[in-house]
Structures are given as structure tokens and as C-alpha cells.
């Protein structure tokens, strides 16, 4: 029998504010622990410099309007300009995919410089295939800092019931073939691939005008504007792009609280080994029980381990604009006070005043489409489908988004190159974004739903599985295999074909 307990790692939107400096990187790269609660960053590739217009004119600047009839045949031979809102991991990976294909892109990041957390996360072999499709440089960046699980199995343990000491389920680690690393290390590695000038920092999106002229006018908090042909919102779980696209009152404009919180830390490996024992401490293990569960695993080739405690916290979250708060370690210890001694020892390793993250997602109110009515604005990653971390696939879904977006935009622009008019350019962008949304909606939204279910199963909250090990295994196995066995290349090819069909 196999286990499917993979390595739930928090999404970008749920990361902490612990950061590591990237002192050897160019200019603005550094850390700012006050700015990265819901947005992570990383960026670099070497083929194009952005020419996107970014002016410091005020919001009353006159943009001469052109009648629809005069636009129909108007020549538009200039390079297409794509804006990505959000310089997180998915925003940067998407940018690298466009740069790799020679597409003009500028990333607008709200933070004043690159920052990232010191937490760990992992990518399956399917996610790595998607990275390779985006750009070989993305995969190279990961492999520079990541390492596979050294233990031959990923194992599930009952962390609560006395006497239940053996792993109840396990699977060969080669099945998902996770490669784990520190988020900060991956950012640093990606940063080595981004051309200078691609990312504009300190750009907080206030609004955009998606007008009939075929351009999108972005307005930023600092009073500057930028006019582009298309926008990709990769601005995280609290996406401003999504809110503008849907409207403030739309049910899907904001994410919802899942009544689960997480305590996470990167710990000395020797401490984890002392708590769990030599075998478990050096491997990828999950311990589940009532209203909580833990995940622990070594990080890459470092003497460190990633540890997360998830627990139920029912009711509402007081401030949905702030997804983390500092608490006392005792609040985490209370969640496992009746658990086995080794799990209590593991949780005791948390710092005295750890951060507690409220886990939000978009499961209750999914967006109706990933593309705006005009077809020139779309959303990706957490902005489109913010997930809980229980399927360990939230970041992977964003990478798949990037693979599809890079492919369909490249396809559409090749089709458009034979007729460079404003209308044809608009049609090309719309075809690309609609193909992306149509291909990605079902899979990514299913992951959001399934991840929520896996969390309930792990915390013995699911009515159908309760504490029955076999039922828990079957419920989770089904959902994990749909992630692991997915054909990313076939999906990308379907998206390419759909884009051509929509453009023709």
C-alpha cells in the first residue's frame, strides 16, 4: 500500500516575513521583512530588455481616443508590450517564459526590492517538466539549489494514537520525485537569469483602464502610468488585478478563510532528528491526528529541515488584509498537547514567538474566468486559483499557468505577425488569453477543491473517512495521482491548438 502524503508547503500568499539577503545580486535585490506577506519575488533571463511605457504623468494625462472604425485597419507594427503585475515566483517564471520567446515584458512589483522567505517548498517531476517548457533556465535555476528526497519513501504516521508507531502508508519517493529547496535560495537562483530593467520596483497597482483603443492603461500609487497591450496579474492571493477585473463587490474578488492556521519554521536538522529519531528525522514524514497535522523533511543539501504544523482555528479571521500574526509558542503546543511525545518535542522546536498564518483560498468563490471581458487582462497563479497547501501543488499550478501563457502568447503573436494591425493584435492577445483560461480552469480549480479536502482528511475532519486509515489513504491517493500523472506536454499542445482555432 502506498502513501500519498506529500510535502504541503505554504503558498506564496501564505509565506512569512523571514527573509535572507541576496547580497551578490544586482542593485535592488535585498530583503525587506515588512513587504512580502502575500507576494514573493524572483526574476532573470537574458534575451530582451523591456520597452514598456512607464511614465510619471498624472492620472489625468490625455490619451487621445480613436474611433473603432479607424482602428480596424490601422497599422501597428510595434512590438507587443506585456505587463506582469506582481514579481513573485510565478510572476517571474512567467516573465522568463516570455523573454525566452522574445516577447517584450515588464514586471511591476510593489516591493522596493527583491525579497523572499526562508521557508522550504518542493516541486514534483511534473512541475519540473512545466518549468522546462517555460524556459530551460527556470529548471536550471531550481536544480542549482534543490535536491531530491534522500529517503526512499514518503511516509504517513499516526501522530496521536498510542502504540501506532509504524508508518501506516508509504510510497516510493520516486513516484512524485519531489525536489525541495528554500524559497529564498530559489529566488536567488532565478534572480541570476533576469535581465536588468525587466522588473520595476515600488509599483503598487491602483487601477487600470481597459479601453477600446486596444491598449491597457495601468495607474500606480506613485502617480506613474504605463500603457501596454496586455496584462497578466500574478499578484497573489489578495490580487489587486483580480479585484479590478471582477469589481469590488464580486464574491470572487477576495479569498476566504479556511479556518486553518499554520506555524512554520526552518529548523536545525539535528533538532528534528533528536525529536523524531534518526530515521524519521532524515526523511519526509507526516504525522496526522485530530484537528491538526505536522509535516517535516530535510531541505536540499543543508543541515536544515522544514517543519509545518497545521491546526484548525474555527471562526473568522479578524483582519483579512493581514494574513499573519505573531503569537506565543504555547498556542501551537496546545494543538498537540495530547499527542505522542515525539510530536510534542517537534513542536517544542518552534521559536518562542512564531508567526501564525491564516490559510485562505478561493475554493468557496472561484473566479468565473481567468480572462477579462475585453480579453486583454488575465490572472494566473494565486491570483487565479489560490489553494491551501495540502496537495503541495499550489506553486506547481502557477508554473503550469506560466507554461501555457508563454506558449499561447508565442503562438498567437506568430499568427498575428502576418497582419500587424491594431485589431489583429487585439485578436491575437484575446485568442491567447481565452485559450489559456479555457485550458487551465478545470484542472487548477479542481486542485483548489481537492487540496481543501485533503486538509480535512489529514485532520480527521472528513465525515466519510474519519480516522479510518484505509479510507483516508484512498481519498488522498486518488487526488494525488491526478497531480502526479498529469501530462503537462499534452496540455500545452491542446492550449496551442485552441489558440490557433480561436485566432482563425
From Swiss-Prot:
Q: Which cofactor does it need?
A: FAD
Question: What Enzyme Commission number(s) apply to this enzyme?
Answer: 1.-.-.-
Tell me the active site.
264, 297
Q: Which stretches are tagged as biased composition: Low complexity? A: 1-13, 45-62
Question: If you read the UniProt record, what top EC class would you report for this enzyme, in one word?
Answer: oxidoreductase
Involved pathway(s): Secondary metabolite biosynthesis
Q: Which residues bind FAD?
A: 109, 183, 382, 395
Single GO term (MF): monooxygenase activity
From the UniProt entry, list the residue stretches annotated as the region Disordered. 1-76
Locate the compositionally biased regions of type Basic and acidic residues.
25-39
GO biological process assignments = secondary metabolite biosynthetic process
Changes seen on gene knockout? Abolishes the production of Aspernidine A.
State the UniProt keywords alphabetically.
Answer: FAD, Flavoprotein, Monooxygenase, Oxidoreductase
> Which family is annotated?
Belongs to the paxM FAD-dependent monooxygenase family.
| PANTHER family recorded | FAD-BINDING DOMAIN-CONTAINING PROTEIN-RELATED (PTHR46720:SF3), HYDROXYLASE, PUTATIVE (AFU_ORTHOLOGUE AFUA_3G01460)-RELATED (PTHR46720)
Relate the protein's function as given in its record. Answer: FAD-dependent monooxygenase; part of the gene cluster that mediates the biosynthesis of aspernidine A, a prenylated isoindolinone. The starting point of the biosynthesis of aspernidin A is the production of orsellinaldehyde by the non-reducing polyketide synthase pkfA. Hydroxylation, methylation of one of the phenol groups, and prenylation, presumably catalyzed by the prenyltransferase pkfE, would be needed to yield aspernidine D. Subsequently, the cytochrome P450 monooxygenase pkfB is responsible for hydroxylation of aspernidine D to yield aspernidine E.
- What this protein is called in its record is FAD-dependent monooxygenase pkfD
